[in-house]
Amino acid sequence: ASDVYKRQFIRNALEQKTGKRIRLWDFKKELERTMELLQMDPSYAERDLNVGFSGGEKKKAEILQLLMLKPSLAILDETDSGLDVDAVRTVSAGIEEYQKNCKGSLLIITHSTKILESLTVDYTHVMVEGKIIETGDASLVDKINESGFAEYERI
């Protein structure tokens, strides 16, 4: 056990970020609303931070932090990795909520374009061996879905 609960961690981080004391009632309501959006059981907020969560629960917990802390830049690395279809939809809905309401930037690193389907994509970059070899708009995602990554493996 970590003795730090998810709820406590998020509230403390939010207070550090804003420099203001967060009223418990306001925080609790926002946390409950956000957890409901992510289809998370309210009891998760009382669990130890990052202890005993399944893979899908960890991913949802990451998106919960994203939505509660509203960073100006978030890097999501393989957020869809290992998720079933329903969990991908839920995580995508959380990311979509961030795009609509948080006015921040996202860098989403993924091998699967499924998570991108419901999101607004401004730029798409293809990396091979740590180098960006092609940049485009959302249509590049469609191109990759149609033809795969094979052409990039030859580069």
Predicted regions and their residues:
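Conserved catalytic loops of ABC-family nucleotide-binding domains
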Residues: 94-108, 116-118
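Conserved catalytic motifs of ABC-family nucleotide-binding domains
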Residues: 70
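ABC ATPase C-loop
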Residues: 66-67
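Hydrophobic anchor residue at the start of the ABC signature
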Residues: 62-63
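Walker B catalytic motif
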Residues: 78-79, 86
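Short, small-residue-biased leader/transition segments that mark boundaries at the very start
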Residues: 1-5
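Q-loop/switch helix immediately C-terminal to the Walker
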Residues: 6-18, 30
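Conserved beta-strand-loop-alpha-helix hinge in the C-terminal portion
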Residues: 123, 127, 131-154
